[in-house]
Curated annotation (Swiss-Prot):
Regions of compositional bias (Polar residues) in chain numbering: 844-861
Record organism: Candida glabrata (strain ATCC 2001 / BCRC 20586 / JCM 3761 / NBRC 0622 / NRRL Y-65 / CBS 138)
InterPro entries linked: Ras-like_GEF, Ras-like_Gua-exchang_fac_N, Ras_G-nucl-exch_fac_CS, Ras_GEF_dom_sf, RASGEF_cat_dom, RASGEF_cat_dom_sf
Protein name from the UniProt record: Guanine nucleotide exchange factor LTE1
Compartment(s) of residence: Cytoplasm; Bud
GO BP annotations, alphabetical order: asymmetric protein localization to new mitotic spindle pole body; cell division; positive regulation of exit from mitosis; Ras protein signal transduction; vesicle-mediated transport
């Protein structure tokens, strides 16, 4: 605080700490700061001696963040304010201190003005998101005031009021309980609280206000707020309109005039140029002006409503070509080329001498030389000099050449005939660049639709999802029957970025489903209580268009909301009906298969005679049925009629369950309650004529330990308990068979039950050894099946076999870990515990060797062709004789007596709900499948496998833990690969469940039955962390690089869109008037430049360093990450490339001439509209080397257009640092609107930014650098704000075409240019 009392700073800064540059203006005379240290700047701004420089400290609050933090600045201001208070209190009672007292008071008031200015005009930048700084200011306001000086108290009260005003302006629904505005004494004692300090009652429902959000997110509003604090004298001087009436009502001096407040409203009435109508224009006002609706934290694009509401580019067709209208008419009348000598005079001779000397100058070669000579020949001389009409001289040859090469050629071409010819050939032509834009947009939506369909199918295959879950991931149920329309009623500006992010998110989801981890495998067992709708896919799937026997009915449409929850199972069927109607298999003559070895595990198996009418390539479908959700028995009459050819086959079916709350209670009812007419749907499915293709199955080796199989004549139907879901898979190696034969029960198989029972005892004895054994290559097999370690699995979309189409045969298994029907293909004794079943199901080394005899396991046939996500759907399957030991309602023995009927009995009625397996299998006549030829040597090798290898198997570890036999090694280390499996075992507490039997087989039968049900219906606890972004957006994983790479993957598939098809290209601008095109580009440029924030300009950084953009879609994708400057520069370059591309692609000579002329006219109209940005884009394109090479087209251009082009091409000349262009922009009429040429300002800012910030590091600031920068920024945003005076009506179709532009790549341009040169 004492620093302000030092000699260098009191009362004003000395020359030792601050340096000035004397500035003289017609209205003021002041010293401008060049360099200074921080305290001297504060003293200078609150100087008690100099006049108030409101512009100076307004500029300071714009650029101070380049060398000071807001906290540091306000600390200096608070210190200055307290120093002034001390000065006033020290000298208020001293007679000799009048001067010091006056200095203190003036400095106090000016410091107060600085603080109030920062609070009112920069609250959003400094305080809105900075709680610490807010608390620091509040602490200063709440300090006790001991002074009785009114000036001090008044300043502090005014600061409190300004602070509360700013707080209320930026927050809604906040109560500060401040005193009445006029309660002077109450304000002295009032203590301000921050929003974070208020009680809940005071800030309930509080939020950022619309004004607050816009103040930190809307560049256009921020720019207008900044301009509103300046007078018009602070800007470039502007030429006023010639209309006195307009000048009186609204002059440039009133455009941005506002003295001290940035938030007051000012509207001015002015009349248009005809004076017939008055308009009211609201000047920059952050409270009343129409603003964009957007959230500062959202990813919504920042573009304004003009571009956002533009219709989507729908067509690239060019229906007609409008004739070119010259922007400037030139009439040349040559009456004669003879000049009589008598008319010569001295004055004429002097004129001739001057002209002759000037014509002797060397002109450049080419078209421009001809034009320059023509202009010189027709230059208007001094009007006092009279020239005869027929006068001629040495310029005669030049004039003849002009007539020959310009006027004659132009007059020889009949434009009406040319135009008629061009319009006749438009049927097969279109704008290739517009078509590319449409194709690029549709590429995103095609990719999203493909991923949605793929993800939907994968989810249906890997787990059952409810309708709500499909809605969560935005997967439409009818995605196959009706594809997403990419272009119908679509606002690309609002959605294209979201589509790109959706595609990336969906890609991540598909990859997750393609590459299943251990976590995913376990998660698949947590089945959801719902079934997706498949009927929408029925008609469109390949290979089954003429097949009416396989129909699916959407039962969920008739289920009430009460049914969509865990329900009580009610099974309806009889034993005999099940045996007679649900066990049908079809075999190929001579094919061999074994009946299931799991006699004890999967009881009540039936064998039937085989069918002899099968052919190679027959089909087998696989369906699992969710008895909880489906209503297979109640099919509509229309559905029944479609499958009437199977209606004569009657049998029991699964009925919809009655809605109860507990799934662990089972009710068994008599089959007489079944309604016969409700059986059509299931019977249609079960009667499907299906056959297997045995050629795809692995062969069983012959030799020791194996027995040659005989001709297969028996088949089986496996029944296993599970929940059941309907899932469909199709293997393309199968085809439908027209044959249908009902199989009978194989009584011989039942006789083999005793032998299987004996085999079970031997397996129990070997169980412990099998647990501790493993071959070395087993880990590789497991990793491949889990999808975790193999990189060879292809994405489903690229797979040659689409396993998600409608199946060719049906395999209905009700299993919570469904599809675990293990059937063997060789006559050796098979293991019956779960682990050995798992080894067989995934192709363990024992069964992975080549086999001589084919296996007819329908599941293995399907899963062998499926992706890992489907083939490894579940790894465990409980035994049919498992006991529900954890059931809280039913006694285990009671369930056993009611649920299991015995080994030699037909399947019970309960097993209808438990399992239906109509697989394509076969059984040999020899029922003694497990003989004495068991390969004990092979088993010994397995037994000797090291435990170290076994410990790496997550499934083995989990199963050992389940059975209570797991022991950690000495090191205590366990692989993280199996952590999820172990967690599930621990949390479910399965290992500690009471054992009903000491028999290992009984313990194995009870494995996870009740706990599995709890997991399946989400009754038990969840062991996995919730991941709400599994199928949704994972914002952290969706980076700009991923979005850009997504667009980079786009390539043109349609040959019609390639550059080699240039003969069919017609630029769309030929369809419209040049003035309309110029106006629409003006609207676009206005919106883009309004996205440039003043803060970005002050700290200019061109962030974009990527490849050149060739389409507006690429700009849209990266728009959210672009600064306003990057967006404007990218659009500028894209427009230049687009104009060049349109000309290069046009091969017809006269059409190219028309295109060049149209661009010249558009540029001229842009100049009249004071749209200097678009004007420069077109001029740079026409003046490029590529376009200038088309000399034949330039020769055909109208003389008036050539004169106009000569004037235009001089504008971007670099002479005197864009002197011509700067002069044009300084002399604009603001009421007409203005689009400044941004490159000029960026060039000035870039050069200025190269200056040093510090003269003396961290001590003396290069103040002039920042004051210059602020002047450039203010002048730029001022001109951008003038664009609000444009009164242009958007033409939606043309506006869309002008927005969504594309260009050729540089390689394509070079290739076409080289081709045309030949």
């Amino acid at each position: 605080m004492d620093i302000f009392s030092q000699r260098d700073y009191y009362p004003i800064p000395s020359d030792d700490v601050i340096k000035y540059k004397h500035m003289v203006h017609k209205k003021w005379n002041k010293n401008e700061v060049i360099q200074a240290d921080i305290p001297s700047i504060i003293v200078h701004l609150s100087s008690p001696v100099d006049s108030v420089d409101y512009k100076g400290f307004s500029d300071f609050f714009l650029f101070y963040r380049n060398f000071l933090t807001p906290a540091e600045l306000y600390d200096y201001l608070i210190l200055r304010f307290k120093w002034c208070m001390r000065e006033i209190e020290s000298y208020q009672h001293q007679r000799s201190g009048d001067n010091q007292l006056r200095i203190g008071k003036v400095a106090l008031i000016r410091t107060f003005v600085l603080l109030r200015h920062g609070i009112l005009n920069h609250f959003a930048d400094d305080f809105l998101l900075n709680e610490n700084l807010r608390l620091r200011l509040i602490s200063f306001f709440n300090e006790d005031i001991k002074s009785d000086m009114k000036v001090i108290v008044s300043c502090l009260i005014s600061l409190k009021k300004a602070w509360l005003h700013a707080m209320k302006l930026n927050w809604d629904n906040v109560l500060f309980n401040e005193p009445a505005f006029s309660a002077y004494t109450d304000w002295i004692d009032y203590k301000i609280k921050d929003v974070s300090q208020l009680d809940m009652a005071q800030k309930r429902n509080s939020r950022f206000s619309y004004h607050g959000i816009q103040s930190i997110s809307n560049p256009d509003m921020r720019n207008r707020s900044i301009l509103s604090i300046y007078k018009s004298d602070n800007f470039d001087h502007m030429v006023q309109s010639n209309s006195n009436k307009i000048s009186r009502n609204r002059t440039p001096s009133t455009l941005l005039f506002q003295k001290d407040s940035s938030n007051s409203e000012m509207a001015t009435v002015y009349s248009n140029r005809k004076g017939a109508q008055k308009k009211t224009i609201a000047l920059p006002n952050i409270l009343t002006s129409e603003l964009d609706r957007k959230d500062v934290m959202s990813n919504v694009t920042r573009m304004s409503h003009i571009i956002q509401d533009a219709k989507t580019l729908r067509s690239s067709d060019v229906n007609k070509i409008i004739p070119s209208t010259p922007a400037k008419k030139v009439e040349l009348i040559l009456n004669t080329i003879y000049s009589p000598d008598c008319l010569e005079s001295e004055n004429i001779q002097e004129s001739l001498n001057q002209d002759t000397s000037s014509t002797q100058k060397s002109f450049p070669k080419g078209i421009m030389s001809l034009l320059a000579r023509w202009k010189k020949n027709h230059k208007i001389a001094d009007p006092k000099i009279r020239k005869p009409v027929g006068f001629t001289n040495k310029r005669e040859a030049e004039l003849d050449n002009f007539v020959k090469y310009v006027i004659s050629i132009s007059s020889l071409t009949n434009k009406e005939e040319d135009l008629k010819r061009l319009n006749e050939n438009l049927d097969s032509k279109f704008d290739i660049l517009s078509a590319r834009t449409i194709d690029e947009v549709e590429y995103l939506f095609r990719l999203e639709s493909k991923l949605l369909a793929q993800l939907s199918t994968m989810q249906k295959t890997t787990r059952t999802l409810s309708n709500d879950e499909f809605n969560d991931v935005n997967v439409p149920n009818n995605i196959d029957s009706k594809q997403i329309s990419a272009m119908d009623n679509l606002d690309l500006f609002r959605t294209v970025n979201g589509v790109a992010r959706s595609v990336i998110s969906l890609t991540n989801s598909v990859n997750k489903l393609n590459n299943l981890s251990d976590h995913s495998v376990l998660d698949r067992r947590r089945v959801k209580s719902s079934m997706p709708n498949f009927y929408n896919r029925e008609r469109s799937l390949s290979g089954l268009s003429n097949y009416a026997g396989l129909q699916f009915y959407d039962a969920s449409s008739e289920m009430s909301a009460e049914d969509d929850k865990p329900q009580k199972l009610v099974f309806h069927d009889g034993v005999d009906e099940l045996k007679n109607h649900l066990t049908q298999t079809f075999t190929k003559p001579g094919s061999i298969s074994n009946s299931s070895p799991l006699k004890k595990v999967l009881p009540n198996l039936f064998e039937h005679p085989s069918v002899d009418s099968l052919a190679s390539g027959d089909a087998c479908s696989y369906v699992t049925y969710d008895s909880q959700l489906s209503q297979m028995g109640t099919v509509k009459k229309s559905m029944k009629d479609e499958t009437s050819r199977y209606s004569n086959y009657e049998g029991p079916v699964l009925k919809k369950k009655v809605a109860y709350d507990n799934l662990r209670e089972f009710t068994f009812e008599d089959s007489k309650e079944i309604i016969k007419n409700d059986t059509s749907s299931l019977i249609d499915i079960l009667n499907s004529p299906v056959t297997p293709d045995l050629s795809i199955l692995p062969q069983t080796p012959t030799g020791k330990g194996s027995v040659q199989h005989k001709k297969k004549e028996k088949s089986e139907s496996i029944i296993s308990p599970a929940s059941g879901r309907i899932s469909i898979a199709k293997s393309h190696h199968m085809s439908l068979s027209p044959n249908l034969t009902k199989l009978k029960e194989d009584d011989e198989y039942v006789k083999g039950d005793n032998s299987l029972g004996q085999a079970e005892d031997e397996l129990i004895r070997l169980e412990k050894n099998l647990r501790d054994s493993k071959l070395e290559n087993y880990n590789t097999v497991v990793a491949g099946n889990l999808g975790a370690g193999s990189g060879s699995s292809t994405p489903l979309g690229d797979s040659p076999t689409n396993v998600f189409e409608l199946p060719s045969s049906i395999n209905m298994v009700e299993s919570d870990m469904d599809t675990e029907s293990f059937e063997s293909s060789f006559e050796q004794r098979q293991p019956t515990n779960l682990r050995e079943q798992y080894f067989k199901s995934i192709g363990s080394p024992e069964t992975a060797s080549p086999r001589k005899v084919n296996s007819n396991n329908a599941y293995s046939q399907v899963s062998s062709q499926m992706s890992p996500s489907l083939a490894n759907k579940y790894l465990f399957s409980p035994d049919n004789e498992s006991l529900d030991i954890a059931s809280p309602v039913k006694n285990v023995e009671d369930l056993k007596s009611r649920f299991l009927k015995g080994n030699n009995q037909s399947a019970s009625s309960s097993q209808i709900g438990a399992s239906i397996n109509t697989s394509v299998t076969a059984t040999p006549k020899n029922n003694d499948m497990f003989g004495s030829d068991f390969d004990k040597n092979g088993l010994k090798n397995i037994m000797t496998a090291s435990e170290e290898k076994l410990s790496k198997d997550p499934v083995e570890l989990a199963m050992m833990k389940l059975e209570g036999t797991f022991k950690k090694n000495k090191s205590g280390n366990n692989t993280g690969y199996s952590s999820d499996l172990e967690k599930e075992v621990d949390i479910l507490n399965i290992a500690n469940l009471p054992e009903m039997n000491a028999n290992p087989s009984d313990k194995r039968k009870s494995l996870m039955l009740d706990r599995r049900r709890q997991t399946m219906f989400n009754i038990g606890p969840s062991i996995y962390p919730s991941n709400t972004n599994d199928e949704g957006y994972d914002e952290e994983s969706i980076t700009d690089d991923k979005i850009w790479s997504l667009i980079a993957q786009y390539h043109i598939d349609d040959e019609n869109l390639l550059a080699k098809n240039h003969a069919n290209h017609v630029p769309f601008i030929l369809m419209y008037e040049s003035k309309d095109v110029a106006q629409q580009f003006t609207l676009i440029e206005r919106e883009i430049l309004s996205e440039i924030d003043w803060k970005d300009l002050l700290d200019i950084k061109l962030l974009y360093k990527g490849p050149n953009l060739t389409s507006w879609l690429q700009l849209l994708i990266q728009n959210q990450e672009f600064t306003g400057i990057d967006l404007a520069v990218a659009r500028f370059n894209l427009t230049v490339d687009w104009a060049i591309s349109e000309i290069v692609l046009t091969t017809d000579l006269k059409m190219r001439r028309n295109t060049i002329e149209r661009f010249i006219h558009v540029a001229e109209h842009c100049r009249k509209l004071q749209n200097f940005n678009t004007m420069m884009q077109i001029i740079l394109a026409l003046n490029s080397v590529v376009v200038q090479k088309f000399t034949e087209a330039w020769r055909l251009i109208e003389p008036g257009d050539m004169l106009l082009w000569e004037d235009l091409r001089k504008i971007p000349a670099l002479d005197w640092n864009y002197h011509a262009l700067r002069t044009m922009m300084k002399t604009v009429d603001p009421l007409k609107g203005c689009i400044p040429f941004i490159v000029v300002y960026l060039s000035d800012l870039t050069i200025n930014s190269e200056k040093n910030t510090w003269i003396v590091e961290k001590r003396v600031v290069n103040y002039s650098k920042f004051s210059t920068c602020v002047q450039i920024v203010k002048n730029f945003i001022q001109k951008v704000q003038w664009s609000s005076f444009y009164d242009i009506i958007p033409i939606q179709e043309l506006l869309s075409k002008c927005i969504y532009i594309s260009s050729l790549s540089q390689d394509e341009i070079e290739h076409l240019t080289a081709e045309f040169a030949r």
